[in-house]
Amino acid sequence: MASVTLKNVCKAYGDVLISKNVDLQIDEGEFVVFVGPSGCGKSTLLRCIAGLEDITSGDLYIGDQRMNDVEPSKRGVGMVFQSYALYPHLNLYDNMSFGLKLAKADKAEIDKRVEHAAEILQLGHLLERQPKALSGGQRQRVAIGRTLVSQPNVFLLDEPLSNLDAALRVNMRAQITKLQRQLGCTMIYVTHDQVEAMTMADKIVVLDGGYVSQVGKPLELYHYPQNRFVAGFIGSPKMNFMSVFIDEVESERVKVQLSNGVSFWIPVDGTTVNRGDRMSLGIRPEHLLSATEADATIHGEVMIVEKLGNETQVYLNLEGADADVIYRQPDTLAVDTGDKLEIGIPAHRCHLFHSDGRACKRLFKENGVDFE
């Protein structure tokens, strides 16, 4: 195990800056997920840590050693790619042991490591098979096993589940999480799927346009996003946003007015808000309520109804909203397309964002989150 430290790291291709002033501390044994949309620089940053890309400026440390100019093979990292990159003519044993054989490791040591990795990954009965005889999930486990036998200080995984179908992805993310907990290893995992990030990570790093937008525990990012980008990216379905007018301001609460004229107080830090400002109110679909239980109500026309059995998702056309408002209830809801529906907004669940995307600090204490 080893810690990973990035100090003001930048990566550029010519005049195009991809990773921008990244400062990050990853502790020994921590499971960290880099998440963000396509093109945000998450895979580039991972490749810089691996040594597959040169760092343009800044410093990278693995443990106490500066690694900027150290060869990839000497950094003590192991990488699993999106593609399995298995040798099709070799069986599983030979695929997993290939790197050790190149390093001229002792035969007994190779056998010991491969057998141990195969036991952990439940591949022991498949070691004589070739990759073509395996399922996608089994192939991905072989790719992980090949990295595991090298006993790296840091595991790097670049979107390893994106080639798998939805059901297998759920199973594999649980297996990878279990493996990391079992080994206690430092693991950095790249994905564009925020559900993977939320379910697997000790700590999430949200990237946007090459910058680190926010770093924190999954529930911290979910309940207390520092900006509108993180609020909209973390959570599925994503947060609803609607335009509001600021009626009154106090130090620990702000009174907002919806497009329908309804006003109510939100418990947020009001020290950066001015009366008369135009701001964005955010509310998650699962936090909306029936109209009788809330501090404020909104009316909309039902555009789409998704009945999933255990829950219902309703898409409402609403004046003042940036897009259709999604209302999510953990039950079957008796509503159809074209109906008029009134739903409620609980003030303590609301988020408030400035026009530049900055969030006002929420003052409501959510369960399971360290609150400062």
Swiss-Prot record:
Keywords: ATP-binding, Cell inner membrane, Cell membrane, Membrane, Nucleotide-binding, Sugar transport, Translocase, Transport
Lineage: Bacteria, Pseudomonadati, Pseudomonadota, Gammaproteobacteria, Vibrionales
Pfam families referenced in this protein's UniProt entry, alphabetically: ABC_tran, TOBE_2
PANTHER family: MALTODEXTRIN IMPORT ATP-BINDING PROTEIN MSMX, MALTOSE_MALTODEXTRIN IMPORT ATP-BINDING PROTEIN MALK
Organism: Vibrio parahaemolyticus serotype O3:K6 (strain RIMD 2210633)
Superkingdom: Bacteria
Binding residue positions for ATP: G36, P37, S38, G39, C40, G41, K42, S43
Catalyzed reactions per annotation: D-maltose(out) + ATP + H2O = D-maltose(in) + ADP + phosphate + H(+)
GO cellular component: ATP-binding cassette (ABC) transporter complex, substrate-binding subunit-containing; maltose transport complex
Protein's gene: malK
One GO MF term attached to the UniProt entry: ATP binding
Protein name: Maltose/maltodextrin import ATP-binding protein MalK
InterPro entries linked: AAA+_ATPase, ABC_transporter-like_ATP-bd, ABC_transporter-like_CS, ABC_transpr_MalK-like, ABC_transpr_MalK/UgpC-like, Mo/tungstate-bd_C_term_dom, NA-bd_OB-fold, P-loop_NTPase
